[in-house]
Amino acid sequence: MQFERADRVAEEIKKEISDIIQHELKDPRICAELISIVKVNMSKDLRHAKVFVSIFDKNRENITSTMKALENAKPYIRREISRRINLRFSPEISFELDDSIEYGARISQILNQLNIAKDEEEEKSQDESEGEQEN
């Protein structure tokens, strides 16, 4: 599959934004346990970048404050992107919270609970049938 230029630029922007967030942003409002850039969607003209951010933290307030800090850091991140990547125009950045990983983990947890309940039920019925055979 041949990548379009927008896809290649999106992947490069994803790497650079991850690096900037991990190593250069010193905002105390970024207090989440783990921040991950999941995906970057670029417009065809490369002027707009929608950055999907996944934030792992049990406290909703930390997630909100981290998103506000990222919004406030947009001018700095945009400037750094233009410095690091050679593009004609520095893309306008918008951050979107992506909770799909958290949602998937929750579904996985529910499925595991169902499997545990099913296993316990099978063990109980097996124990009952063994008890009947002894009589």
Curated annotation (Swiss-Prot):
SUPFAM superfamilies registered for this protein in UniProt: Ribosome-binding factor A, RbfA
Q: Where is it found, in Gene Ontology cellular component terms? A: cytosol
Cellular compartment(s): Cytoplasm
> Which processes are annotated in GO (biological process)?
maturation of SSU-rRNA
User: What GO molecular-function term can you cite, just one?
Assistant: ribosomal small subunit binding
Keywords in alphabetical order? Cytoplasm, Ribosome biogenesis
Q: Which PROSITE patterns match?
A: RBFA
Keyword Ribosomal protein set for record: no
Where is it chiefly localized?
cytoplasm
Q: Which residues does UniProt call coiled coil? A: none
State the InterPro entries in the record. KH_dom-like_a/b (IPR015946), RbfA (IPR000238), RbfA_dom_sf (IPR023799), Ribosome-bd_factorA_CS (IPR020053)
Under PANTHER family, the record lists:
RIBOSOME-BINDING FACTOR A, CHLOROPLASTIC-RELATED
Q: What quaternary arrangement does the UniProt entry report?
A: Monomer. Binds 30S ribosomal subunits, but not 50S ribosomal subunits or 70S ribosomes.
Question: Could you tell me what this protein does?
Answer: One of several proteins that assist in the late maturation steps of the functional core of the 30S ribosomal subunit. Associates with free 30S ribosomal subunits (but not with 30S subunits that are part of 70S ribosomes or polysomes). Required for efficient processing of 16S rRNA. May interact with the 5'-terminal helix region of 16S rRNA.
Listed HAMAP family: RbfA
NCBIfam families with a match to the protein in the record: rbfA
Family membership noted in the UniProt record: Belongs to the RbfA family.
Q: What is this protein called?
A: Ribosome-binding factor A
| Taxonomic lineage from the root | Bacteria, Bacillati, Bacillota, Bacillota incertae sedis, Caldicellulosiruptorales
